[in-house]
């Protein structure tokens, strides 16, 4: 299939979803938000004030970059390996900064075992404790899944021994926790995990203040597409909205909505929001506006990094190009699944800044810092 025909088919799919999404109150974008013939910027403006910080240039593989702030310092972790993605030598490393611009590291945070490699599962900050969630995944066969563990620190230097996250019945979580669990105003924490067999994704929640125990699988009926790697946000009407990558190659985001604080969710439905079949992120700004960050190319290309905004949490009618092909450096070294582009963004609001962490070409750990007052 040539590129032009592919874009036409994706555009038809996007437009066909627009009316249905509007009627059913699912997230969507105006049909003219992106200019498909513009393969450089998608017709989007840049964002003044957005600046890039390179945390680490890796000689091998780096991905799943996550940033947080704790105790007056910034912490950034990612998975690292010598050459390829998800190999037995994959470990989690982190770097530390006092100003968010200059970083020390990387420092080993978690090492692989004889039978598992380890990837980041997210930061959880509660009071004077910072917790790093670590996903230990079967090295010989990823379809056998993994398990979520954690380590904690009170000073940013000394870490506890690994302990398993636990389900409500006390069992260890035999699942891979997605990297940006959301704490709701009432104290509940909502996220998603990929459970055995294979990568079966399911929303999860806990009322444990520390978010270390009490995890429960939410009710999540089967729906459209092949959902993976979601992120969630709280809409102004207090509905929880979870956006998913569609591994079935629809090249649009999937969505599920919860009206009971994450206990039950609607079946996944295709949106008209274009995607690159990649991990993305979503969240809520301090003024209540919802946002998502991803690669809305309608193809496998991840060479455009876009931030989209919505006042009501459903119509994303404003978008900015944070980085595009012109900003993309060449890949330095070959490696399995080292996709060119802006990979796996995750975002968090720290103070008056939206921090977007990602991997460039799955080689470099990079941050984009966006002043909230510029949005």
Where do the language-model regions lie?
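Bacterial N-terminal signal peptides that target proteins for export
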Residues: 1-7
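Bacterial N-terminal signal peptides
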Residues: 8-16
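Charged, often glycine-rich, active-site loop that binds/positions anionic groups
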Residues: 121
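Beta-rich carbohydrate-recognition and catalytic domains
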Residues: 19-60, 68-116, 124-178, 182-277, ...
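Short glycine-rich, acidic/polar surface loops and turns
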Residues: 279, 343-345
């Amino acid at each position: 299939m040539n590129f032009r025909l592919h874009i036409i088919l994706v555009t038809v799919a996007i437009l066909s979803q627009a009316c249905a999404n509007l009627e059913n109150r699912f997230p969507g974008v105006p049909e003219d938000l992106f200019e498909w013939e513009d393969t450089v910027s998608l017709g989007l403006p840049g964002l003044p004030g957005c600046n890039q910080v390179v945390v680490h240039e890796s000689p091998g593989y780096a991905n799943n970059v996550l940033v947080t702030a704790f105790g007056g310092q910034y912490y950034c972790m990612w998975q690292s390996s010598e050459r390829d993605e998800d190999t037995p030598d994959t470990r989690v490393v982190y770097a530390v900064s006092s100003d968010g611009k200059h970083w020390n590291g990387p420092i080993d945070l978690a090492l692989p075992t004889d039978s598992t490699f380890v990837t980041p599962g997210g930061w959880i900050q509660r009071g004077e404790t910072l917790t790093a969630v670590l996903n230990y995944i079967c090295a010989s066969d990823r379809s056998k899944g993994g398990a979520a563990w954690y380590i904690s620190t009170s000073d940013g230097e000394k870490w506890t021994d690994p302990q398993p996250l636990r389900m409500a019945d006390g069992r260890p979580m035999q699942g891979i926790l997605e990297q940006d669990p959301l704490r709701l105003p009432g104290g509940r924490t909502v996220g998603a995990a990929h459970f055995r067999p294979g990568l079966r994704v399911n929303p999860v929640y806990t009322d444990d203040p520390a978010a270390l125990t009490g995890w429960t699988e939410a009710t999540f009926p089967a729906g459209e597409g092949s959902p993976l790697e979601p992120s969630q946000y709280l809409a102004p009407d207090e509905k929880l909205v979870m956006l998913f990558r569609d591994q079935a190659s629809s090249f649009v985001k999937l969505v599920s909505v919860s009206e009971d604080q994450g206990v039950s969710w609607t079946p996944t439905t295709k949106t008209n929001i274009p995607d690159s079949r990649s991990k993305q992120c979503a969240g809520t700004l301090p003024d209540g506006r919802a946002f998502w960050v991803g690669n809305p190319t309608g193809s496998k290309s991840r060479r455009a990094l876009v931030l989209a905004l919505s006042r009501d949490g459903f119509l994303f009618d404003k978008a900015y190009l944070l980085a595009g092909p012109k900003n993309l450096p060449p890949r330095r070294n070959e490696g399995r699944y080292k996709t060119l582009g802006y990979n796996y963004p995750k975002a968090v609001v720290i103070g008056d800044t939206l921090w977007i962490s990602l991997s460039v070409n799955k080689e470099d750990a990079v941050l984009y810092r966006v002043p909230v007052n510029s949005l």
